[in-house]
Amino acid sequence: AFRGNQFAKGAAIGILLLTVFAGFRIYHLLPASLAFAFMIALVIGICLLAVLQDALALAVLGILAGFAAPILISTGSGNHVALFSYYALLNIAIFAISWWRSWRVLNLLGFLFTFAIGTTWGVLSYKPQLFDSTEPFLILYFGIYLLIPILYAIRRGSDRPGAIDGTLVFANPLIAFSLQAWLLARAAFVASQPE
């Protein structure tokens, strides 16, 4: 009955998320800012519910909805600072959830979505003039995903001594430093061009 209860809650929140999306995108009843605020409120609610009820499935639904929200509610403005600020808050929320629950899958989902969306934005929209507003987010994301495996090891240490999240321990520096090199190479190329 407990798992069925979680399924019902997850389905209800999923329906609410789809309702907000339809109200914005299909029926044009909600402005983007209000639809986004509703989605954020739903994501916060589902993540709190997941932690309080120790429900990993609800947490996964919340994080997936959280990463999808700016894509679903996008107006095409291209404001990368707002997008990366929102993802920074979402990643800090994942870190906070990691403080109470050692849910590895949540850490991996956050890492994958953050760097996949960031890399996609970089390939499609990055210009060297945006370096100063992009670099701090890369450093912040690297720092968050540097701390999460440490916290995971501490939390899991009593259950499984020596447990580490090797995926994040090795993938985080590999991807972050690759992106850093790419950002600097693009900036150096522009700086070397005659004016």
Predicted features by range, described:
Residues 1-195:
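Alpha-helical multi-pass membrane segments and their bilayer interfacial helix-loop junctions
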